[in-house]
Amino acid sequence: MNNEKRLPSLEKPWQKYLPKENLGIEVPNKSIYEYVRDNAQRVIDSTAIEYFGTKISYRSFLERIDRFADSLKAIGVKEGEYVSFLAVTFPETITALYALNKIGAIANFIDPRIDVEGIKQLILDAKSKVLFVLDFAYPKIKPILED
């Protein structure tokens, strides 16, 4: 067995699963927020998200991201910190992901279908200082908050 250190980032083992025409594509050195912000300018009034018939343009999406990022900073969320969400995927959670990425914080999305102990452990493992909970999931989080 070869004992030298092997770095997946250099070996790129995932490439064996990609179509050959995708292997030469260069990944931009940008955050996901920067990528969307920069590319949205070309299609600013086009639909970024459509959810149950409601369309959100890139312009509106970017404005929502900026407002959410400002709100997160206002409550003290800093770069490198985890923010947990007990939620399902809908426009607000997508906005939250990009807002957190904009300020350098990390999203910890938790599936509300898992059991209370699992939810508690995921929050503790991430050392989340902020937790967003959908109303239907509150009964699961209530015993954790009381603990």
Language model features by range: what are they?
Residues 1-2, 102-147:
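Structural core segment of the AMP-binding/adenylate-forming
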Residues 1-29:
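Flexible, non-catalytic linker and terminal segments flanking ANL/adenylate-forming cores
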Residues 20-22, 44, 105:
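Residue-level signal for pocket-adjacent positions within structured domains
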Residues 24-27, 60, 107-110:
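Short, flexible loop segments at the rims of nucleotide/cofactor-binding pockets, characterized by
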Residues 27-28, 33, 37, 45-90, ...:
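Conserved AMP-binding/adenylate-forming core of the ANL superfamily
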Residues 39-40, 144:
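Hydrophobic helix-cap positions at the C-terminus of alpha-helices
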Residues 41-42, 109:
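Charged/polar positions on well-ordered alpha helices
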